[in-house]
Amino acid sequence: MTKTLEMLHDFVWGAPALVLTIGVGLYLSIRTGFAQFRLFPAAVRTFVRRFRPGSGGETGISPFQALCTALAATAGTGNLVGVAGAICIGGPGSIFWMWLCGLLGMATKYAEAALAVRYRVREGSEYLGGPMYMICHGMGEKWRWMGCVYSFFGIFAAFGVGNATQINSVISGVNGVLCRFGGGETPTGNLIMGIFLALLVGAMLLGGAKRIGQTAERLVPAVSAGYILLCVGVLLLRLDRVPGAFCLIFEGALSPRAATGGILGSAFQALRVGCSRGVFTNEAGMGTAAIAHGSAEVNHPAEQGMMGILEVFLDTILICTLTALVILCSGVTIPYGCDVGGELTTQAFTSVWGDWVSVLLAGALCCFAFATILGWGLYGIRCAWFLFGHRGMKLFALLQTVTVAVSAVLKTETVWLLAETVNGLMALPNLIALAYLSPELIRLTREYTKRTGTKPVEVTYAAFHQCKPLRTFSHEKVPSPGRCCKKEGQEDLSSEHRPARSAHP
């Protein structure tokens, strides 16, 4: 079973997939004039000025809640466990490739979030967005099958990367703490922890997007800030080793053999591991965060797109980098070639702070994992609704809750292989859609900046789709969507209509 998964994983994350993931990120960066850098200062200003914790109103969640929900799904065990695994398997150089994927992924996530708002629909009292709606309404009904393929893999990914890997990491972290203080791992104890978490997850999923968003906006900032402070404390105490850690990262990217003492010798392995773990931790290219961002009430699609830029920066460039530096600066022995999961991260912190910090790490890991399960629970529910309607949502919520308990007794290696494999499979239709719809992304970006620089202007674009022309509640002259969203006989509801540019690249 494991060998079969390894073969499938290597095929999915082979050279073609890496070229596609990095290539689309580079393509979108060039087409938007490297919007992830031009709009970054504006994104920070907008976030500080306008996006504060609070209610999103009757039809959606607030932009801050959308960002926290997306971060809840990304800033999870990938930051603690995934980074350690990347260093063990791919060497320190894998962090360099994780950075590269992160920088290009900022453009990808910008596109995902902006287009999710552009092509979302309204169902009852909620906005529904994501790659499946981008594909259906942006590319046309003839591509609906590709949206169904994405939703199908999205449901399986919610059980894997958004559930099983998180619970597995929590169990490993808690058992590690118990072992340090004289306890031990027992199957019964694992199952009890799984059942307890399952009950919490089930209660949250029943509350829908609003309850998940409200939980995320309180949990994610607090836990992230605490973890960052722990990391900064370690680096201040080991400040003399920080330059050497950066040297290992850059040297390992081109010559893993030199950086790992001859144990790892493939530069492509460092690239492959860094990219696959990078996608796992920031999910740029997978399109999942677009589901959360598409639920936000914002004035313009590009405005929420900028929150996508911040999301990847906080997750990969900040938190993942801090984790990697802590491991490399702590002085712990790194078991190259053997993925030991979060135990390496725990050893790095305890070697500096002592065993007591393992309790804090286990608590942070539990909170991160719980938030990730909630975020992915929302993604899975949206995918199930797209495929099967309301009954599919209820069935998914039930299965997701049961899977939490079952995942407590699964093996780590099998879970991670399966999760990364499904990640690669669901990224393909999303990346195709992003490239196809890039002209509309460019138009939105230019409309937002008014071609006068990078300073954003106040534009009201609170719009939604229902497979009909764009409805706008603003004084701006906003174009209606392409013909693929307009049914025969429907009237344009915009005050003044200007046809959108063709979505063909």
Give the predicted meaning of each segment.
Residues 1-77, 87-94, 105, 405, ...:
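N-terminal alpha-helical transmembrane segments of multi-pass membrane transport
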Residues 18-23, 99, 147-152, 178-207, ...:
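Transmembrane alpha-helical segments of multi-pass small-molecule transport proteins
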Residues 20-27, 31-44, 167-174, 189-197, ...:
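Membrane-interface loop-to-helix entry segments
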Residues 28-29, 101-125, 136-168, 175-204, ...:
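Helix-loop-helix module between adjacent transmembrane segments
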Residues 31-36, 78-83, 160-170, 201-213, ...:
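Transmembrane helix-loop junctions in multi-pass membrane proteins
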Residues 47-67, 102, 113, 117-158, ...:
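Transmembrane-helix boundary/entry motifs in multi-pass membrane transporters
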Residues 55-89, 115-118, 124-132, 136-138, ...:
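Alpha-helical membrane segments and immediately flanking helix-loop junctions
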Residues 110-119, 124, 232-248, 259-262, ...:
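Extracellular/periplasmic helix-exit of transmembrane alpha-helices
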